[in-house]
């Protein structure tokens, strides 16, 4: 059984028919380094779209290449010189043990999937199937590091990865579908949805619903944008961030902004304050959710090539928030 594997070659967005709103969400995720969850029915294309994210990301910087190479050396992974600048993508199976996910093991320290994905993508397909093992993930996302206890000594491995995950809305996959009847009871749907910890849902900035593509769209000869074109916009947004954060230690993307940096770089105008005041009241947003919306809006403004976050950027950011679970 394969427990942990690379993600394979990136999928070109042009291969995916329709799903324009999902593609836009992936563009925003790539531009700002935001975590993303794709939810949809069976065969809706969730995994294909998740794999497309890697093709939108810029290459590793020289500093990042060295950091990734050090982890690969510790894990005794063979280096591919031709792909040294390509961001890693690791896709562990739900059957993977905690040690395979998070690191550890008897004898020498072995980096887990979260560290092997450092400065790249951690792809968790069928997220609810990982079950209780997901409990450690929120703290790792916050710290961007993995702490491994061995013989009373804490060892720290880097784990600054971008999470991209997929899930069905319920065990059978048809909850909320207009064409297929869901076979699950409300209680079963609730138990399934709650297998993704609330703390983890809260840390995922972009939640995307992936509908099944209808026959007309599926058989249309119309092609969407290739990943290379989208990646150019992502690269331009990343360059804006690199300039902005040149003097800010340990920050390379908007997703990594701390509170002080949010205050400095995510200021709102009067219309923006009015919109967010209404959103906080109507959606009962926590302080953490509020700050994540600002980070995301900063990325959307960067994609638009503007310095000031406006109401349109905030409105799009709010659309990516998680829907309430049952």
Regions found by a protein language model. Name each.
Residues 1-36, 149, 290, 307-326:
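Peripheral, non-AAA+ core regions of ATP-driven protein-machinery
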Residues 2-7, 77, 116, 256, ...:
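A short alpha-helix capping/helix-coil boundary motif
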Residues 11-194:
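Conserved ASCE/P-loop NTPase catalytic core
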Residues 109, 131-326:
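Basic, amphipathic alpha-helical bundle interface domains used for macromolecular binding and assembly
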């Amino acid at each position: 059984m394969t427990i942990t594997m690379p993600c394979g070659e990136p999928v070109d967005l042009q291969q995916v028919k329709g799903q324009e709103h999902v593609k836009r969400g992936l563009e925003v995720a790539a531009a700002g380094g935001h975590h993303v969850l794709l939810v949809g029915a069976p065969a809706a294309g969730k995994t294909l779209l998740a794999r497309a994210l890697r093709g939108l990301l810029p290459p590793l910087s020289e500093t990042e290449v060295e950091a990734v190479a050090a982890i690969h050396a510790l894990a005794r992974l063979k280096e591919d010189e031709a792909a040294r600048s390509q961001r890693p993508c690791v896709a562990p199976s739900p059957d993977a043990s905690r040690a395979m996910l998070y690191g550890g093991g008897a004898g020498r320290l072995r980096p887990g999937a979260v560290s092997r994905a450092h400065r790249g993508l951690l792809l968790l397909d069928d997220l609810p199937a990982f079950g209780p093992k997901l409990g450690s993930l929120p703290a790792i996302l916050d710290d961007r590091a993995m702490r491994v206890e061995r013989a009373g000594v804490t060892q720290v491995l880097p784990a600054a990865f971008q999470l991209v995950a997929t899930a069905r809305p319920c065990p059978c996959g048809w909850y909320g579908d207009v064409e297929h009847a869901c076979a699950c009871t409300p209680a079963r749907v609730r138990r399934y949805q709650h297998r993704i910890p609330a703390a983890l849902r809260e840390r995922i900035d972009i939640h995307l619903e992936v509908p099944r593509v209808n026959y007309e769209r599926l058989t249309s000869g119309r092609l969407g944008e290739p990943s290379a074109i989208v990646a150019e916009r992502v690269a331009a947004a990343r360059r804006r961030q690199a300039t902005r954060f040149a003097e800010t230690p340990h920050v390379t993307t908007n997703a990594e902004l701390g509170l002080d940096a949010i205050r400095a770089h995510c200021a709102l105008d009067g219309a923006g304050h009015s919109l967010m005041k209404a959103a906080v009241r109507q959606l009962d947003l926590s302080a953490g959710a509020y700050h994540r919306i600002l980070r995301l809006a900063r990325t959307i403004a960067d994609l638009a090539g503007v310095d000031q976050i406006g109401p349109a950027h905030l409105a799009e950011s709010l659309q990516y928030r998680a829907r309430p679970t049952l």
